[in-house]
Amino acid sequence: MLYTAVWAHRGASAYAPENTMAAFLLARRLGADAVELDVHLTADGEVVVCHDNDIKRCSNGEGLIEDKTLEELLSYDFGYSALFGERFKGE
């Protein structure tokens, strides 16, 4: 019997900000078998999830991930967006 796996691209990114825990958990609740995501290394060698190598599009910050420490990245909000407003603030 054939089985078709459902992959959630950046989580349930149509319903929650991409690559956030909210998007990943919602994808699972919606029945996704797996999540596709991208990872990058920070300036201090930590692994973070983000599609772009620049954080401007998906956060309230600017700059390249590779130039920022994890502590710096944690100071930005990756949950707010014009699409979702305040609903996922702080993700």
Language-model features, listed with the residues they occupy:
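Short, glycine/acidic-enriched loop or turn micro-motifs at the edges of active sites
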Residues: A12, V39-L41, D54-I55
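N-terminal amphipathic alpha-helix/helix-capping segment at the start of soluble metabolic enzymes
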Residues: M1-G11
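Short, acidic/polar
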Residues: A16-L26
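Conserved beta-strand positions in the central sheet of alpha/beta enzyme cores
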Residues: W7, V35-E36, V49
